[in-house]
């Protein structure tokens, strides 16, 4: 059922400037497109809200609304998001109880899987009703056409390749009914029968199929007391086609290390090129970072030596979380928003005195690409010279009565005042409204917070590629023209900041003309030949 690894490399996801990045460089996509590195015929944002969550969200808006960069944008989301405003298609997807899905978490030293199921579909089917798709059950139950994602991709693949001539459809055909469209129950039946060790035997002991077992219990313990994985002996099938380096004893397969010989046994070792715990990293030396081959202190962009207090510069910590909210996914939780709906700027009293502000006053926080206006909370919980503003808050919508639930969003005016220069101003905050939930008329708070992430430039670490969230800012008392919730961003400056950070990188190729070390894992790993740059 799985297609072979692709023999192509997508540089819009895995740019050659970041050969050691663990994940794709998705937050840089608007800047890659702006540079002309490519264009997208269709972009799917899947349960992803880059306009709000990512840094530099206005550059995302510019890219998503420019058909020379993104021809079409489909937003797959279980809840409305700021990104959905700038989509050609908004496709409602099911929450955890509205879809089939597999999940696991780091709860204890064990390997286990959980099986989510669309409860309304199952309930209606137990009443004798039949459905071809989960969205049909949701429509029957009054939810509307809410799809589950697995069925969407199956159906889309058959629509794109109806006769199979493109070679796509065959990966979405039933393993039990050759040539027929894969059904959602068959998809999970095959997984449970073929790729979950021990599940078929456990199910058989109760007279159940693996699928029925998971439908009954919803979870399965694959392996308990999982410790010392580096000592795990490799199986004969894992060793097939492998070679052993006579000097290092590293076991390699398809050019990548999979284990190491210890006392005559091939064991998994650690996920490094040497399969040992590495104090010295030959990879960093080979990829032209010799100064970081052993652990050491790296002076960051917000190190105190890089903060000029005489100019009013401070360090902003924008990443601390509230225990009540989750990114932009908890806006519908009315009780949680009743508890937490503000994200003031935490400021030490010494800094408040220097700025001439007290708790509740407005300050302007200036970043490299813009500013936001927020209220002050003076507290000795902060260190002088450092401010903090919590995540989660600052949700917004562009229309009064639709496009974002009203429990958590402020109505805003967003406009481009000059090319690349964007201004957002709050029209009004959260207000009571009439709905089938009587609590909506009892809303007693107005504050929706301030969207600070819009004002952050992308700051990709030159080695790992991960975004460096901490910001060097200048804080001042708000002017007479400033209003609470104001956000201003210059995307021209944002692109200049991107270029400045890009110049810090040391791009591929590496040894043997590689785009990326062969030993490093990555999602949707291409064929080995795709790792090599053309030429030479």
Give residue ranges: language-model regions.
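Extended redox/cofactor-interaction regions of prokaryotic respiratory oxidoreductases
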Residues: 1-86, 94-101, 108-113, 213-355
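Long, contiguous, secondary-structure-rich segments that constitute the structural scaffold
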Residues: 121-204, 330-346, 350-536
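Short hydrophobic/aromatic-enriched beta-strand-loop microsegments
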Residues: 90-95, 99-100, 365, 385-386
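Post-signal/leader-peptide non-cytosolic segments of secretory proteins
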Residues: 114-117, 128
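A conserved C-terminal secondary-structure "cap"
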Residues: 192-227
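Alpha-helix capping and helix-loop boundary segments enriched in small/acidic/polar residues
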Residues: 31, 74, 104, 140-147
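Alpha-helical scaffold elements adjacent to nucleotide-binding pockets in ATP/GTP-utilizing enzyme cores
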Residues: 59, 86-89, 152-155
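Short, solvent-exposed loop/turn motifs
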Residues: 90, 277, 371-372
């Amino acid at each position: 059922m799985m297609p072979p690894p692709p023999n192509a490399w997508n540089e819009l996801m895995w740019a050659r400037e970041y050969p050691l990045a663990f994940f794709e460089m998705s937050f840089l996509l608007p800047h890659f497109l702006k540079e002309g590195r490519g264009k997208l015929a269709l972009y799917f944002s899947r349960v992803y809200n880059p306009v709000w969550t990512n840094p530099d969200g206005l550059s995302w808006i510019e890219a998503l609304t420019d058909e020379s960069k993104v021809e079409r944008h489909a937003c797959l989301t279980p809840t409305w998001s700021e990104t959905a405003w700038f989509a050609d298609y908004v496709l409602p997807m099911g929450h955890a109880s509205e879809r089939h899905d597999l999940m696991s978490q780091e709860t204890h030293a064990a390997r286990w899987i959980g099986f989510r199921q669309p409860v309304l579909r199952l309930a209606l089917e137990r009443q004798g009703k039949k459905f071809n798709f989960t969205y049909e059950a949701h429509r029957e139950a009054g939810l509307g056409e809410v799809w589950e994602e697995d069925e969407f991709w199956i159906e889309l693949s058959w629509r794109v390749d109806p006769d199979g001539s493109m070679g796509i459809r065959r990966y979405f055909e039933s393993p039990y009914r050759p040539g027929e469209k894969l059904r959602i129950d068959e998809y999970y039946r095959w997984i449970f029968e073929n790729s979950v060790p021990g599940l078929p035997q456990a199910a058989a002991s109760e007279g159940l199929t693996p699928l029925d077992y998971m439908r009954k219990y919803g979870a399965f313990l694959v392996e308990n007391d999982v410790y010392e994985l580096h000592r795990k002996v490799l199986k004969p099938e894992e060793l097939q086609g492998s070679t052993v380096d006579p000097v290092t004893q590293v076991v390699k397969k398809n050019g990548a290390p999979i284990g190491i010989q210890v006392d005559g046994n091939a064991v998994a070792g650690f996920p490094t090129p040497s399969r040992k715990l590495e104090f010295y990293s030959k990879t960093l030396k080979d990829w032209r970072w010799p100064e970081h081959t052993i652990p050491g202190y790296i002076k960051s962009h917000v190190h105190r030596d890089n903060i000029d207090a005489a100019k009013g510069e401070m360090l902003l910590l924008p990443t601390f979380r509230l225990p009540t909210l989750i990114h932009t996914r908890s806006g519908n939780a009315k009780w949680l928003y009743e508890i937490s709906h503000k994200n003031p700027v935490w400021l030490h009293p010494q800094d408040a005195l220097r700025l001439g502000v007290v708790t509740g006053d407005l300050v302007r926080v200036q970043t490299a690409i813009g500013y936001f206006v927020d209220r002050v909370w003076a507290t000795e919980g902060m260190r002088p010279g450092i401010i903090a503003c919590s995540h989660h808050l600052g949700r917004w919508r562009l229309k009064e009565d639709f496009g974002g639930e009203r429990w958590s969003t402020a109505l805003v005016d967003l406009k481009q005042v000059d090319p690349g220069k964007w201004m957002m101003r709050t029209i009004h905050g959260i207000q009571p409204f009439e709905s089938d939930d009587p609590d909506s008329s009892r809303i007693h708070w107005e504050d929706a917070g301030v969207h600070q992430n819009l004002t952050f430039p992308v700051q990709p670490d030159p080695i790992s590629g991960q975004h460096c969230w901490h910001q060097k800012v200048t804080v001042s008392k708000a002017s007479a023209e400033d209003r609470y919730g104001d956000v201003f961003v210059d995307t021209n400056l944002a692109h200049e900041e991107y270029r400045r950070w890009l110049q810090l990188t040391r791009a591929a190729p590496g040894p043997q003309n590689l785009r990326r070390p062969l030993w490093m894992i990555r999602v949707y790993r291409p064929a080995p030949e795709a790792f090599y740059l053309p030429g030479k």
